[in-house]
Amino acid sequence: MNLKQTRLHILHQAADLSKEAKTGVSLHCHTQHSKEMLDFVPHYAEKLPIISHFWKKERDRYREQKGKELDFATAFWLPPLVEQEVYDIEKKQINDSGLEAIVSITDHDCIEANLQISEQIGNEQPPISMEWTVPYLYGFFHVGVHNLPKTRAVEISKQLLDYTFGEERKSGELHDLFAMLNDIPEVLAVLNHPLWDIEMVGKERHKTLLDNFLSEYGKWIHAFEINGFRRWSENKAVIEMAESFGISLVTGGDRHGCKPNTVINLTASRTFGEFAEEIRVDKRSEIALMPEYRQPLKSRQLQSFAEILRFYPEHPAGRNRWFDRVHYDNGDGGGLRPLSAYSWRFANGPLWLQAAIWTLGFFGSPQMRPFFWLTMEAKDRVPKQSLFDGEKSRAANRSADDPLATDNSPLVTDN
């Protein structure tokens, strides 16, 4: 597969990237301000071995006691780290690679973390961004809206969120919102994880939804996302789709735990505005898959779950336990409250749930990764060497031990 607009670096060990670029750009990461919906819980809980048995018992017990079903439609959880911690972790990984860093935090439908970061490190001018939930027909999409103008960020984000959460949506309103974003040259609108059936409507219905969405709004989408928490086979399909549409590619790590993003963009730009022009106008992109991305996805997901669910003694009371960060409305009139406000105040929940959490932590440990390597499908194994530019003369000059080494069958080509 030879792409015209993208160069891809696949690193299998840490490397100095200062000869490849000036700046590393980390997109799509989440902080304590990001409300992560839990409406998927019943869907997956019924499919997980062992857990499904206890889940059904709890569900039936709740129905018997309350006379109604468990309702996760409004329930959400919050990632454990504050914005400064997330920013510092992302910045360090990029700096350790010999690059200047730009970090774009994208909490769900919220710019609070960005505003606070801007106050704390204003001299670095971090972009003000968010992951915007865009309702569409019978589903929704997530659009990374990066680098809102600081003087208008609150105003624009309110307009976007009024559309997301408003009871009535006017005809043509979404067109107007996308056009508004497109008219701001330094803003980047990214369709995050486009092939993921996140709305759980089924693969074919999601494809129909995506095709219709792109037909209507694709001209205002500046890039598709290669996502750090999606399978390689899916990301490869996104690369192919971007090529067919003539749309640029960017990365999005989508981190929620304590580890840095596993994918970043490389650029010669010094500011996010310059980077946005590179993507929007020049339509060229340079991407690095960090060594951690090559690790089995299921193992990385479980490790992230374990980080999300562990105890953080250094955090303030009311936020250091996982059940302080999970909010649920049990229908008693008290609205959404942390689980710790219910009967979990002095305990860690039912024993079966404690056991399930321990199991997640065990299987998410690095020691268990060999097991996941054995069960990993061939199509999801990331190539061992970088196949990023097709310049055979350049490849010939690289050592076999070079983490950026290429072979003669480039995955991505510069023309």
In which residue ranges do the predicted regions lie?
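Short, acidic/polar
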Residues: 82-94, 205-214
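Short, well-ordered beta-to-alpha junction loops that form the rim of enzyme active sites
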Residues: 107-108, 192-195, 253-255
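Divalent metal-dependent hydrolysis catalytic cores, especially in the metallo-beta-lactamase
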Residues: 52-58, 67-79, 90-110, 188-190
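Binuclear metal-dependent hydrolase catalytic cores centered on His/Asp/Glu-rich metal-binding motifs
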Residues: 141-188
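Loop/turn elements at helix/coil->beta-strand transitions in domains of secreted/extracellular proteins
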Residues: 99-100, 124, 185-188, 219-221
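Charged catalytic cores and adjacent phosphate/nucleic-acid-binding surfaces used
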Residues: 1-62, 115-116, 120-125, 136-155, ...
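Arg/Gly-rich low-complexity intrinsically disordered repeat tracts
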Residues: 406-410, 415
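Surface-exposed amphipathic alpha-helices with a cationic face
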Residues: 117-118, 174-190, 238-247
